[in-house]
Each structure stands twice: as C-alpha cells, then as structure tokens.
Amino acid sequence: MGQGQPVIARRAVLASAAALALPACEGKREITGALLGASTGRGHLLRDLRAIRDAAQPPTSKQTRVVIAGGGVAGLAAARALRQLGIEDFVMLELEDAAGGNSRGGEIAGIACPLGAHYLPVPGDTAREVQHFLEEAGLRKRVSGRWVYDERYLCHAPQERLFFSGAWQDGLLPLQDVGAATLAQYERFSRLVARAQQQGAYTMPVAVTPPSAAHLGLDAMTFDAWLVRERLDDAHLRWYLDYCCRDDYGTGLHTVSAWAGIHYFASRHGFHAPGSQADTASASEEEHGVLTWPEGNAWLTRKLGDGLGERLRPGHVVTRIREGRHGVTVDAYDAGARTTQRWQAQHCIVALPIFVAERTIESPPALLADRARVMRYAPWAVVNMHLREPLRDRPGAAPSWDNVVYGSRGLGYVDARHQSLDPRPGPTVLSWYAPLAEGERALLLSRSWADWLHVAQAELAQAHPDLRERVTRVEVARYGHAMAIPAPGTLARTAAGLPHSSRLSYAHSDWAGYSVFEEAFTAGHRAAMRVA
C-alpha cells in the first residue's frame, strides 16, 4: 500500500478479463465472482427524492416512540443504549438488507470474511462507552485488578508484514537496508509525535476534549505541508505515513490535515522508532493490540443487533424526516414491497451520513447544510478472494494477518484463517482493500469483479505470482462514500458541535470528521442518552 503506482490500463484489464472467461481454452480453473456492497440502486434513489415521493402510494402511518434512521454502527449503538434505558418502543430503518453499515461481513465457501472494517484497536479510557460494550460482549474482563482481553480475539502473532526489497519483513515500517538517514528521520518523527502527545490531548472520541489552538493550527494545513515544514522528506517514512492515512482515512497525506495525520498515532499507540526502548516495550503490551475476527467488525455489529427482531427494518430507504411541534414524521421507501411507509414518533435519531441527512431532513438546519456542503468522502472496494490452497511464499517474515506490498496503491490483504487455531493449511479467503481517489468513484460502477481481480493480481504480483492459479471465487464489496475525509478545516467545523433540536438527535461518525468504530459507537450511544 503506497504511493502512486499507476492504475492498470483499461485495455489491459479487459484483455485479462477475457482470459478469465475462457478457462477451458487455457487449461485454467474456472473462477466465479460477484459484485456486492452498498446497494447503489437504493442509495441513488436519494438523488431524486421528489420522484420517489410523488410516485409512492399514499403512505400508511405507524406509531413508535423513537425512529432510528440508519443501521450502521452508530444506529446499532443507539438501539443498544435505548434498550439499556428501558426504551423498547423504537424502529430502525436501514437501506441495506442487513444492519452494520461499513462493518458488515460475508462468507465464501463456508469461510467468513469482512465486507468492510476488519479490526478494532483496543480502545483507550476516553472511549468508555466502547469499553463497556466490549465487557458486555465478553471480550474483556477484570483479572487481579487489571483489564484482560480474550486472547482468542486479539490478533495473533505475527500481526503484519511488508514485502519490501524483494522479501517479506516483520512490521510495516520499511527497515531493510534503508540507511542511517532514514532511521534518523524515523527517530525525529517519533520525537515529534511524543511532543504532540505531551502538549495536548489527542483523544478518541475527539469530542471528549475541545481542540486547542495548536490543534486548530495543525488542522489548517495538510499533513504533507507539515512534513515539509518539519523537513521530514524521507521517501520510506512518507510512504509509511501515507499508507497509515489511507488505511484510516481513505486518502493520503496530501489530502488529510496535519492534525489528522498526527492524531492517527498520538490518539493510540504513538510512533516508536525501530530499536527504541518504547518500541521494545510496546511490542508485548496488550493495550496496543487489535481485536479482529474472520468476518471483521461484523462480529461486533451482530452482537449489537442481537435481539432487535422486527424492530430492525432492512431494505428501507428513509426519504423524508419532518420535525413538527408535537413529534417527528419519517417516511421510508420499502424496497421489497415497493411502497412508502410513514412513521409518527416522538423522536428521531438521525444515524445517517451527513450528506444523506441533509437531503432527507425537511428544512435542514444551517449547521447540517454547511457541513454537508464541504464534506468529502473516500470511495472503497474490498476484494474478497477465495483460495483453494495457500499461496507460495517469498523469503522472509512468515505469513501474517496483514500483508502489505510496498509501493502499491492498495492497502494489502488480511487472511481470514489467521485467527484459526487449526495448524493445517487449507482453503482461505484473502480480503484485499483498495481505497480510490475521489475522482475514481465511477470505477465502482464500471469495473466488473474480473477487473478487480486483475487489479489485485497486478498489485500483488511481486509477492504472489501464483495468486491467479489459486483463486476460485471473487466477491467485491463497493462503497461510494465509505468514510469521511478529515481534510484541513474539519476539526474546526467539528468543534461547532451538533445541530440543536428537541426531537432530532444526530449520530454518525461523520460528525467527528473521520470514520472509525469508536467515534460512531460513541455518537450513537450519546444520541440515545439525549432521547432519555
């Protein structure tokens, strides 16, 4: 996962796709595939809400205390909190056929795999609500006065490796023969992150602490501009930092703010130069680990959705939210029945992306409209490839959970069998992650699953030239607006808070300016508290 490798030529992709269609002619195994992911047809209905409203039959009307609009992590966390408060009279309206948003999972040939987010870093003490949920889910407990996480779900070693200079190395920071100048810049960046942590709180969720003047200054420039100012120009360091930004924010260091770039490290584990005392000490600390499952964070969203029953209404596109003096009216298009339903409620938790909320709320408040006008989103694809047997490996570090090729545009792949306790090699699913540039969103509609396989194959060819002959099936999850981009100015806008309303509560990670589980969960939990 790295900088600037050119996109594979369209003509070459189509030529390769044709080869897939003729496996018998070349003596190759047949590969099947499918395109999955966010329901583009339903989502694009929001482009012309007037047509839906005019074409719909007169809506039936139902009563409930609370409508939760949106069934992603924020909506699910809100539902959990409502139930904890004793509020059972609610309904959740979700566009997709299953709740979970960007944290849904799938299965190929009986092997679970992620369709989106695939891990959760062990949360710090500022994410109290998330910690409480993990305790409730049985993932952590107190033993002899300290918190201990279930080792089955902490990522097993080896956690990550990088294909660099013709071989695999442990960890993702380039190390092999990088030279003294590179190592010196690693150390300088480590000191700068440590100083930033000491000078001001980098919290997650961000709303825990109001931004300082120093944070707002960093928010006003790009991460790239800050690195230039600090004379951090080493190509290996910049590749790694760009990779980290694309992994968490969907886009690179030329686009995200300096605050976001530093926050990635300062809010969690810091940045430890190789060989430093902190690097050695942190290697064994449980609090720096990540929780993961074969199906990714779908494990968490399924836990959140347990017990919702008929209160969860999948396949429902929210088309209008109208706040009145005595309640809220919510209209939703039932994609299965092809009818519009109307819900009358005392309160609505708007757990929708900001750009969707602005289109669905009648007379949206100025703060919402202003945020929607400047929001930027990163498109993503997740390419799940079922392999009939393990890949042949190159020299160096052993196969890991996260496997990255230096210099590629993708973010590498995770292995669905990594957490398995069965030592016998066998079929598996590799999930390859590909963030796209904002201008490449149309590729999500134009590329076939075969195109995506060849893009993945081209990017992984250095490390795995045998990938094509091992694949049996490909399923591609596509997200046109996968995550908010924390571009310069985002933190300042986040500091303005949420729109004030007596009957609408807003809950989505968009309001934090970037998309991670901790932000979405906390937003949903706090929205439910406002209902009470």
Where are the regions a protein language model picked out?
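Extreme N-terminal leader/targeting segments of oxidoreductases
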Residues: 2, 6-65, 84
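Conserved flavin/dinucleotide-binding core of flavoenzymes
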Residues: 27-55, 165, 171-173, 392-532
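N-terminal Rossmann-like FAD-binding beta1-loop-alpha1 element of flavoenzymes
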Residues: 65-91
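Glycine-rich FAD pyrophosphate-binding loop
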Residues: 83-106
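Dinucleotide-binding Rossmann-like beta1-alpha1 core, especially the glycine-rich loop
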Residues: 111-195
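Active-site rim elements
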Residues: 115-123, 209-216, 286-293, 370-374, ...
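Active-site/ligand-binding neighborhood in enzyme catalytic cores
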Residues: 201-317, 325-327
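Mid-domain catalytic core of redox enzymes
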Residues: 310, 314-429, 463
